[in-house]
């Protein structure tokens, strides 16, 4: 019997007890998990250094190293995140609606856990803690499979978390880590229908596509973020520049960072030099189409494959468009359904953009970086769903539940 099947069986068994745990039991567990995380800070940072040293030797990019790195502050933030989940309302047991049929049956909808959640992700060890906290709060057992880049960090984090879970009296197998990071085991996990109720991949396009191609377990796609900002002809240049810089340069390795900049042809000669100067001052390399190159001749030419690429780095590609309609067409062709923004003072164009752009989050005069559970007021999130079934956009606690129908009768037969 493989390690994964054993973990699957243990998770399924744990999910039954965890699913009926009280809010107080779950909140107590989260508090103790946070305490154990802080106690293990030294061990976690030592383990993370092993991962970072290996990543540097492999020539990993600066942006990806930032994703991988753990510091005192980041671990304290992870612990604080667990405590923040305590403050969120527990959705489990909520009766959403109740109605009575003519025959006297009373029918209701009640929120219940999904059961066992599998999460496959890459070099972001903070996901390990975030996912564990959200799953505990919603009564779901979780099987975590992180990338090989962060395996030592993840082991240390899960060791601390499971110590806290065990101390709280909840099943230790509520949170488990798959320590074999081979593709074969990942594929086996994608097909573990007997034990895993839903699979959530978090990572780049390659990982997402591999899961969609191989999984027989139902998948919630947390898609890649090829996010666009369209700067309309009627806009405040200073606002537009500041939004572009924030969306691209504040943290380029995350999925809600802007990857493409579309500029209306009527303002490009005036606006492009301003924004390119600001981008370069923030360390961002700029690629562009032929029109962009004709205005600033040292811009690198953007190839066709650039338009659909998620860089996750200090790179942005610029395209000049005729109007809002061409911008919308380009976004709907190359976007990934994540987050898209228009900078405009035109109400008409803003409404057209909101209605026609097909994405989970569509912005008017704001940075795409706000697509985040905490920024939306949901608290922590498990990921940003770019699909339309079950969940779309930031996935908070309610998105980790399903519906059970409860029916009360007094002897009715059909």
From Swiss-Prot:
Pfam families: Aldedh. CDD domains: ALDH_F18-19_ProA-GPR (cd07079). HAMAP family: ProA. Keywords: Amino-acid biosynthesis, Cytoplasm, NADP, Oxidoreductase, Proline biosynthesis. One of its GO terms (cellular component) is cytoplasm. It comes from Clostridium beijerinckii (strain ATCC 51743 / NCIMB 8052). This is Gamma-glutamyl phosphate reductase. One of its GO terms (molecular function) is NADP binding. The lineage of its organism: Bacteria, Bacillati, Bacillota, Clostridia, Eubacteriales.
């Amino acid at each position: 019997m493989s390690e994964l099947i054993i973990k699957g069986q243990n998770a399924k068994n744990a999910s039954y007890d965890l699913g009926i745990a009280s809010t107080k039991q779950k909140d107590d567990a989260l508090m103790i998990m946070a305490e154990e995380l802080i106690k293990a800070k030294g061990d976690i940072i030592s383990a993370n250094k092993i991962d970072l040293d290996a990543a540097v030797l492999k020539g990993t990019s600066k942006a990806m190293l930032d994703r991988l790195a753990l510091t005192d502050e980041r671990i304290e933030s992870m612990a604080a995140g667990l405590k923040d989940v305590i403050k969120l309302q527990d959705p489990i047991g909520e009766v959403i609606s109740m109605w009575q049929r003519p025959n006297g049956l009373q029918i209701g909808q009640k929120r219940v856990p999904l059961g066992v959640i599998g999460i496959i992700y890459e070099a972001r060890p903070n996901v390990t803690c975030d996912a564990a906290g959200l799953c505990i709060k919603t009564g779901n057992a979780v099987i975590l499979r992180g990338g090989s880049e962060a395996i030592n960090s993840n082991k240390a984090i899960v060791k601390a978390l499971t110590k806290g879970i065990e101390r709280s009296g909840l099943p230790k197998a509520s949170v488990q880590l798959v320590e074999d990071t081979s593709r074969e085991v990942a594929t086996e996990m994608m097909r573990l229908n007997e034990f895993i109720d839903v699979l959530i991949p978090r990572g780049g396009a390659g990982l997402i596509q591999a899961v969609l191609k191989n999984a027989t377990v139902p998948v919630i796609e947390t898609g890649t973020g090829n996010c666009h900002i369209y700067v309309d002809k009627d806009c405040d240049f200073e606002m537009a520049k500041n939004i572009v810089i924030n969306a691209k340069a504040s943290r380029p390795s995350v999925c809600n960072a802007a990857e493409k900049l579309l500029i209306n042809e009527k303002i490009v000669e005036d606006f492009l030099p301003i924004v390119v100067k600001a981008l370069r001052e923030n360390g961002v390399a700029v690629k562009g189409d032929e029109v962009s190159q004709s205005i600033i001749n040292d811009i690198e030419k953007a190839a066709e494959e650039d338009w659909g690429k998620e860089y996750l780095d200090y790179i942005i590609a610029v395209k000049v468009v005729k109007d809002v309609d061409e911008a919308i067409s380009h976004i709907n062709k190359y976007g990934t359904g994540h987050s898209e923004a228009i900078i405009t003072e035109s109400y008409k164009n803003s409404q057209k953009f909101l209605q026609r752009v097909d994405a989970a989050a569509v912005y008017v005069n704001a940075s795409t970086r706000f697509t985040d559970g905490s920024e939306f007021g949901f608290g922590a999130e498990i990921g940003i769903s770019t699909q339309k079934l079950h969940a779309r956009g930031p996935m908070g606690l309610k998105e980790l539940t399903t519906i059970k129908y409860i029916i009360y009768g007094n002897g009715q037969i059909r």
